[in-house]
Amino acid sequence: MDMALPEFSMRQLLEAGVHYGHQTARWNPKMAEFIYGDRNGIHIVDLTQTVPMLDQALKVVRDTVAKGGRILFVGTKRQAQKPIAEAAEKCAQHYMNHRWLGGTLTNWKTVSQSIQRLKQLDEVLATGAEGLTKKERLNMEREQQKLQASLGGIREMGGTPDLLFIIDVGKEDLAIAEAQKLGIPVVAVVDTNNSPKGVDYVIPGNDDAARAIALYCDLVSRAALDGMSAQMGAAGIDLGALDVAPEEETLEA
């Protein structure tokens, strides 16, 4: 059966600045085949290639979720942190947006122990932390905040993911190396200054502009939701009957 997939147009990509690469001097020759030309010293990405490649990436995201797989969204640079977290939360997936924790994939056992510690701290602090001195409580709160910042987005992952979605492969090279070691496929936005090496599903495009990042995150999140509805549909659940409560979104300042 052909499942739905979020639609997007070349025009949307242009409006979001997906075609703007980096200064020609900063280019990576490995991206040459995806470069259309240059304008005022800036490389322009060939969107006639980006469109089908982005479509292919979204299919992989959707199909992974439809089979019950887990997706890890990775983007730790400042302008990607919020959209990465929001997109992952919107489709009940997982994210790392603070700093890539070495061993997140290759040493999952140790990472899951830290997640257990975070859950334990949450519990103790939520129940009022009785019998603790002020100093002990403060230390616990500090430890909790630190763990929450680095592990909050993967606390419910429950094991290594089945697919990674990455923004800025130059910055997230450690994540790619770990995924390669474990044979976990990678979907990633690759700008003209980076190498597509190690990326299974390349999305050639700008990885700095806020609007471009927001667009990729939104599309990937919607593709994951399409996969989820396909999975539930296969299980005979009517999604129309499950109204998603929008209330909680309005609480955010």
Curated annotation (Swiss-Prot):
GO terms for biological process: translation. It holds the Pfam family Ribosomal_S2. One of its GO terms (molecular function) is structural constituent of ribosome. InterPro entries: Ribosomal_uS2, Ribosomal_uS2_bac/mit/plastid, Ribosomal_uS2_CS, Ribosomal_uS2_flav_dom_sf. GO terms for cellular component: cytosolic small ribosomal subunit. Keywords: Ribonucleoprotein, Ribosomal protein. CDD domains: RPS2. It comes from the Bacteria. Belongs to the universal ribosomal protein uS2 family. NCBIfam families: rpsB_bact. This is Small ribosomal subunit protein uS2. It comes from Cereibacter sphaeroides (strain ATCC 17023 / DSM 158 / JCM 6121 / CCUG 31486 / LMG 2827 / NBRC 12203 / NCIMB 8253 / ATH 2.4.1.) (Rhodobacter sphaeroides). The lineage of its organism: Bacteria, Pseudomonadati, Pseudomonadota, Alphaproteobacteria, Rhodobacterales.
